[in-house]
Regions:
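Active-site-facing substrate-recognition patch
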Residues: 1-64
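PRPP-dependent phosphoribosyltransferase catalytic core
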Residues: 2-15, 140-186
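Solvent-exposed alpha-helices and their adjacent loops that cap or buttress functional pockets
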Residues: 30, 90, 114-118, 141-146, ...
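Phosphate/pyrophosphate-binding loops at sites that engage ATP/ADP/AMP, CoA/4′-phosphopantetheine
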Residues: 57-68, 139-145
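Short glycine-rich phosphate-binding loop at a beta-alpha junction
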Residues: 66-75, 153-154
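Conserved acidic residues
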Residues: 69, 120, 150
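Short, glycine/charge-rich flexible loops or terminal/linker lids adjacent to PRPP-binding catalytic cores
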Residues: 82-123, 131-136
Length: 186
């Protein structure tokens, strides 16, 4: 089945505005305060929006010419984004993975769970980013596991320095599907 990426982007933006944007004072995971919160779990776990997330993120990566074999990021925000991309990729053989904040000390003592990333081209995904901290934690974990990071891609960029931090500290392209301005947030 072929999908219209422009229509998918428009519908996903509409769903984000309707379901995920919560106005009011909040403290973000970065410790910064904001006048709104974008709860993208309301999108990435939503029956209609999740497939759109997968197609839009895959389209974003394809348009940028990013080749990869696996996609994932820091648990928990990135978990459903990775599986959405995996499903959208269909028969392309893209795996999903999750990255723990710290390496386990029991079991297999892994920080990266799922199909192995060692020697594979991977993309780090995130739902939203303020400073890039979660993405950078995932980058470090995946690199320690032997993954070859091709890019960091987020659904919504808050335009508060994440792109610069990722470029400077990880040295990989930083892509986003929507800016806060795309969603009418200032």
């Amino acid at each position: 089945m072929t999908h219209d990426l422009t229509a998918d982007r428009a519908r996903l933006a509409e769903l984000i505005r309707q379901l995920a944007v919560v106005h009011g004072k909040v403290t973000l995971s970065s410790g910064k305060e904001a006048d709104y919160y974008i709860d993208l779990r309301r999108i990435t776990l939503h029956h209609e929006a999740a497939p759109l997330v997968g197609r839009v993120m895959l389209g974003l990566l394809d348009e940028a010419g990013i080749e990869f074999e696996a996609a994932g990021g820091l648990t928990m925000g990135a978990d459903p984004v990775g599986t959405a991309v995996m499903h959208a990729a269909g028969d392309r053989g893209i795996d999903a993975f999750v990255v723990r904040k710290t390496q386990k000390v029991h079991g297999l003592a892994r920080q990266v769970e799922g199909p192995g990333v060692d020697g594979r081209k991977v993309v780090i995904l995130e739902d939203t980013s303020t400073t890039g901290g979660s993405a950078l934690t995932a980058v470090e974990g995946v690199r320690n596991a032997g993954g070859d990071i091709q890019a960091v891609a987020v659904i919504v960029d808050r335009d508060t320095g994440a792109a610069e931090h990722v470029a400077e500290q990880a040295g990989v392209p930083y892509l986003y599907a929507f800016s806060k301005n795309d969603l009418g947030l200032d």
